[in-house]
C-alpha cells in the first residue's frame, strides 16, 4: 500500500525550483533532458514523478486546465504514436498541457487497450474487496486486480458503488447465487409436462398437453362415449324428461308422499300420491346420442304436451 500524500512545503518548492534551474542549464538526463531522478535525490521523501508533477503544476504558467478538446486528444494520440511514453517531450510538443496531464489523459482515457465495458457484479464485488485490502490506493488495485482498467475508472466506479450504498457481501455468499430458491408452491408449472396425462378411454395416438393451448385446435374432438368404459349391448335406458328420473331398467318411479301429519283430510296421504308420471316421456339412447319420440307405457297415460 502506498503512503498517503503529503503536501509540499514552501521550503520544498524553493529547493525544487533551484534544482530545476541547475538541470535546465546543464541537463544530465538522457538526450540532454531534465534529470528528474537527480532532482528527487536531493528532496527527501519525493520521487522523480512527484518532482516533475509539482514543477509543472506549480511553476509552469500558460498551461490549460480542465476538459480536453477533441483537437488536443487527436494531437496527443499522434504524439504518443511518435514518441511513445516520453511525456516531457510530448508536453513540449503539446504546448498547452504539461507532462503529467498528457500521461493521465492517455492512461485514463485514450489508451485503446483500456477496458471500457460496463462493470459486472463480480467485478464490483472484487473492487469492494480490494478496497478493504488496499484502501484508496487505486494504482495498487489496478495493478493487482484490474490491469485492463484505468485507475481513474476504478476510482469512479467505487464512488458510484458508495453512493448507491452497495457493500461487500459475506465471503461465503455471492450476490449472483445466494438468493433463496422459490418455494415449490410459488413455482410455475413447466411449459412442457414431464409426462403426458392420459385421458381414460382416449384414442390411441392422440396426445394431450394441458399447458399447450395451441394443441386444442389440432386434437380430435372426443364424444361422450369416449369417456365411458366399454359395455355389452343393453336395452336403451328410458329417461323421463319431465320428472328428471330414470325409468325402465333403473326400476325407479318418483312418488311424492308427504307426511300424513300435515294433511288432516288425507291421513294416509293417498290423495297426494301420483301414480301417473306427468309430462312427455322421451327416450335417450346413450349409445348413439339420439332422442326418440314419446313412448306410451301400459297402464300409464302419456300427456301430449
UniProtKB/Swiss-Prot annotation:
**Cross-referenced PROSITE patterns:** HTH_MYB (PS51294), MYB_LIKE (PS50090)
Enumerate the subcellular locations listed in this protein's record, separating them with semicolons. Answer: Nucleus
Q: Which GO terms describe its biological process?
A: mitotic cell cycle; positive regulation of transcription by RNA polymerase II
The induction comment states: Expression is induced during co-cultivation with Streptomyces rapamycinicus.
Could you list the residue ranges that cross the membrane? none
Q: Which GO terms describe its molecular function?
A: DNA-binding transcription factor activity, RNA polymerase II-specific; RNA polymerase II cis-regulatory region sequence-specific DNA binding
CDD domains in the record: SANT
Q: Say what happens when this gene is deleted.
A: Results in a significantly reduced expression of orsA and orsD, and in complete loss of orsellinic acid production, during response to Streptomyces rapamycinicus.
Name the principal localization, coarsely classed: nucleus
Among SUPFAM superfamilies, the record links this protein to: Homeodomain-like
| Top-rank taxon, per record | Eukaryota
- Renumbered residue ranges of the record's region Disordered: 175-215
| All copies of domain Myb-like, residue ranges | 5-59, 60-110, 111-162
User: Is Membrane found in the keyword set?
Assistant: no
Q: Where is the composition biased (Polar residues)?
A: 198-207
Q: Under the cellular component aspect of Gene Ontology, which terms does the record hold?
A: nucleus
Keywords per UniProt: Nucleus, Repeat, Transcription, Transcription regulation
Function noted in UniProt: Transcription regulator that acts as a central regulatory node for the integration of external bacterial signals leading to the regulation of secondary metabolite gene clusters such as orsellinic, lecanoric acid, cichorine, 2,4-dihydroxy-3-methyl-6-(2-oxopropyl)benzaldehyde (dba), emericellamide or microperfuranone clusters.
The protein's name in its UniProt record:
Myb-like transcriptional regulator basR
